[in-house]
């Protein structure tokens, strides 16, 4: 519901909760990914008429090579550490860097014109890495929607579509390289899928009552809190 109202926050919050409950880092990322696939897919369906298609095309064009690079890196790590499965690797060490990047983008970078659509090409590539090695690529791409002349519905829809394809693309990596069997996790995933659907429907209703200025303030505030959480992830 949080993601449906302000475009983000729900995924990272869920990732943090799952990290507490599930000890295996790779399984947290894998299960979080399929839940977010449904969550973003639901938002894409609800807001499909608001998707900024040019941004999405650029993002996907960068995402595909990014995912292939992720698969190549995972394979290289398997060979280097001489393990039988990528499930034995620790892959969540980049989270603090994402937090630092967000703070820089929001508050420290030289302000100028809004980011062009072309920037989403290389951001798609970075997301192909982040979605596998970190789990939540939303905070990475979200700052690129700040100060753009698009509506709050455009932000919600386009960001959700970008993340949907990112989570979809990483499923084969976790199935074949991390030996994740999603069918065995059905009892855990099904209730969460149902909650995601109704949360999105309610979130859309609330978004319609939210002024654009308030939305952008909440969006930036949520990004800042998420950045701080990512930077201190190894402390708490």
List each model region and its residues.
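Residues that define the loop-to-transmembrane-helix transition and helix capping
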Residues: 26, 92, 153, 213-216
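Transmembrane helix exit motif
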Residues: 40-46, 70-83, 92-119, 205, ...
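Structural signature of hydrophobic alpha-helical transmembrane segments
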Residues: 20-37, 86-100, 125-135, 184-195
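Selected transmembrane alpha-helices and immediately adjacent juxtamembrane segments
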Residues: 1-22, 108-159
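Membrane-interface alpha-helices at helix entry/exit sites of multi-pass transporters
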Residues: 25-32, 54-56, 149-161
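Cytoplasmic-side transmembrane-helix entry/capping segments in multi-pass membrane proteins
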Residues: 53-64, 95, 116-126, 156-161, ...
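Small-residue-rich segments of transmembrane alpha-helices in multi-pass membrane proteins
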Residues: 20, 25, 60-71, 102, ...
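Selective hydrophobic functional segments
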Residues: 31-85, 168-212
């Amino acid at each position: 519901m949080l993601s449906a109202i302000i475009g983000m926050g729900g995924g990272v919050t869920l990732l943090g909760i799952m990290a507490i409950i599930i000890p295996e880092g790779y399984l947290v990322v894998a299960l979080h990914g399929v839940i977010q696939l449904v969550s973003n897919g639901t938002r894409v369906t609800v807001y499909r008429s608001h998707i900024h298609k040019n941004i999405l095309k650029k993002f996907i064009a960068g995402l595909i090579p990014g995912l292939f690079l992720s698969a190549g890196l995972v394979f290289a790590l398997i060979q280097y550490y001489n393990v039988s499965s990528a499930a034995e690797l620790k892959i969540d060490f980049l989270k603090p860097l994402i937090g630092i990047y967000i703070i820089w983008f929001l508050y420290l970078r030289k302000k100028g014109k809004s980011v062009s659509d072309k920037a989403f090409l290389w951001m798609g590539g970075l997301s192909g890495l982040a979605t596998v090695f970190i789990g939540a690529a939303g905070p990475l791409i979200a700052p690129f929607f700040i100060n753009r002349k698009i509506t709050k519905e455009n932000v919600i829809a386009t960001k959700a579509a970008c993340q949907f394809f990112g989570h979809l693309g990483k499923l084969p990596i976790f199935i074949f390289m991390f030996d994740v069997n999603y069918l065995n996790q059905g009892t855990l995933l099904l209730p969460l899928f149902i909650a995601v659907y109704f949360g999105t429907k309610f979130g859309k209703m609330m978004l319609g009552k939210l002024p654009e200025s308030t939305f952008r303030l909440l969006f930036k505030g949520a990004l800042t809190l998420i950045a701080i959480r990512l930077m201190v992830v190894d402390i708490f």
